[in-house]
């Protein structure tokens, strides 16, 4: 079965620090991973599957289109960045794992990458809070949101994903 991605390469490049010259193959898997981990957990299986099917069939309209463009795409853009950034400077080739460097630039430190990841997480959580507020007040527009059964993923309504600090 085909996988529907809720954002395009253009969405990611236009709304993040990812350069337009970056090869799609370097980050596309992080979009898919973030979509499956984060979006499905907030949508639940039934609504996630409905939106995926509509995207594949090119029939996404009305309230569902609004939900995707206003809430899900911004969430996914920033969740994908939290997944991609820690790996952005590495590549795995037949000779091993390599860290990229440039003659006229400086590689970001781990602390700098962690800072960027945290900022992207804050953006993602902001859009997620907006989504949760919207879907709670408008769940009647999306019957799939409340129709999960048995082994389906049930929608998560808790946005706080921050790490514990003791």
Range-by-range predicted roles:
Residues 125-127:
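Low-complexity, serine/threonine/proline-enriched polar segments
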Residues 1-73, 87-95, 99-100, 106-108, ...:
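Conserved short "hinge" loops at termini or chain/domain junctions
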């Amino acid at each position: 079965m085909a996988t529907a991605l809720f954002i395009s390469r253009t969405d990611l490049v236009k709304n993040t620090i990812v350069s337009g010259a970056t090869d799609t193959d370097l980050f596309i898997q992080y979009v898919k991973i973030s979509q499956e981990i984060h979006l499905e957990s907030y949508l639940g299986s039934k609504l996630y599957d409905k939106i995926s099917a509509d995207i594949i069939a090119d029939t996404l309209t009305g309230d569902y289109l609004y939900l995707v463009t206003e809430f899900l795409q911004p969430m996914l853009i920033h969740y994908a960045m939290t997944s991609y950034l820690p790996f952005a400077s590495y590549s795995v080739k037949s000779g091993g794992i390599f860290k990229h460097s440039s003659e006229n630039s400086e590689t970001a430190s781990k602390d700098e990458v962690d800072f960027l990841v945290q900022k992207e997480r804050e953006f993602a959580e902001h859009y997620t809070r907006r989504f949760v507020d919207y879907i709670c007040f408008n769940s009647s527009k999306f019957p799939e949101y409340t129709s999960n059964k048995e082994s389906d993923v049930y929608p998560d309504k808790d946005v706080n994903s921050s790490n514990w600090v003791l």
